[in-house]
C-alpha cells in the first residue's frame, strides 16, 4: 500500500486517500475509503460521480488502480472499523441511485447486513447492471447469505479482477423510486451513468469532497 501511496503522490496533486459518504447497515452513514484515482474536485466537473471509458479526470495511476481494483484496498480499514464486511451488498452513495427515503421497504432489506468490499451483484454484472436489478441481487444475497456463498463470491471476484470484466460504466442505467402520488408505484428514468452529476449542495451535505 505504501508503494501505491507514493505512486499517487508522484502522479498528481491531492490526497492519497479519497473519502466519501455511503449508506451502510440499517441506513447508517459512514465514510468509505479508497485510493484516489481521479483528479481533485472531479465530482464537481465533467460527468460528475461516475467515470466512463477514457474519462480524462482519471489519473494515469488511477487507471491502473481501477483496472486492478487496487483502489478499493483502503476499505479494509472500513472492515476493521466494523463499517463493512468482506462480502455483502456494495454501499451506495447517500444521494444515488436515490436518497434513503425513496427506497422501498423491499429495497431497504439489502441494508439488513453490513455492506461488503465485494458482493453478489459485483460478480453478476458489476458496473454493467442497472440499479433495480443490482438491488434485487443484493436482496437475494441477504435472503441466501451463507459461508459457502461468500466463498463462491470471493472466488468469482478474483476471476473478475484478473479478467477486468464489467469494470467500465459503459451504458445506460435505469433508476427508480416510489412516486409521491401512488404509494409503492415506481417511476423509471433512463439516464446515462456518465451524466450523474451531484449538485454542490449534495456534495457539501454528504462531504463528498476529497480532503
What do these predicted ranges mean?
Residues 1-41, 147, 152-194, 200, ...:
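A hydrophobic, helix-centered structural microdomain
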Residues 2, 51-113, 154-157:
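A short, structured surface patch at a secondary-structure boundary
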Residues 13-16, 104, 114-116:
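Short solvent-exposed loop/turn micro-motifs enriched in small/polar/acidic residues
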Residues 18-19, 46-47, 87-89, 94-95, ...:
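Short, hydrophobic secondary-structure boundary micro-motifs
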Residues 18-57, 117-136:
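Short, glycine-rich, amphipathic interfacial segments at transmembrane boundaries or analogous
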Residues 56-59, 145, 149:
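A generic "alpha-helical surface" signal
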Residues 133, 139-142, 155:
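Short beta-strand/loop motif that positions the catalytic acidic residue
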Amino acid at each position: 500500500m505504501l508503494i501505491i501511496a507514493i505512486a499517487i503522490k508522484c502522479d498528481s496533486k491531492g490526497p492519497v486517500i479519497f473519502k466519501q459518504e455511503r449508506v451502510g447497515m440499517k441506513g447508517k452513514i459512514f465514510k468509505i475509503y479508497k485510493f484516489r484515482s481521479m483528479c481533485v474536485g472531479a465530482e464537481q466537473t465533467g460527468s460528475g460521480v461516475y467515470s466512463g471509458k477514457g474519462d480524462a479526470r482519471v489519473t494515469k495511476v488511477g487507471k491502473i488502480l481501477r483496472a486492478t481494483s487496487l483502489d478499493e484496498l483502503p476499505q479494509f480499514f472500513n472492515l476493521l472499523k466494523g463499517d463493512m464486511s468482506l462480502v455483502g451488498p456494495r454501499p451506495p452513495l447517500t444521494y444515488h441511485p436515490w436518497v434513503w427515503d425513496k427506497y422501498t421497504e423491499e429495497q431497504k432489506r439489502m441494508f439488513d447486513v453490513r455492506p461488503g468490499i465485494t458482493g453478489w451483484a459485483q460478480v453478476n454484472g458489476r458496473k454493467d447492471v442497472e440499479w433495480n436489478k443490482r438491488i434485487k441481487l443484493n436482496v437475494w444475497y441477504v435472503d441466501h447469505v451463507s459461508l459457502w456463498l461468500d466463498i463462491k463470491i470471493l472466488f468469482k471476484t478474483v476471476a473478475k479482477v484478473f479478467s477486468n470484466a464489467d469494470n467500465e460504466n459503459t451504458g445506460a442505467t435505469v433508476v427508480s423510486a416510489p412516486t409521491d402520488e401512488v404509494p409503492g408505484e415506481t417511476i423509471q428514468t433512463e439516464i446515462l451513468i456518465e451524466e450523474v452529476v451531484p449538485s454542490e449542495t449534495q456534495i457539501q451535505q454528504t462531504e463528498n469532497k476529497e480532503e
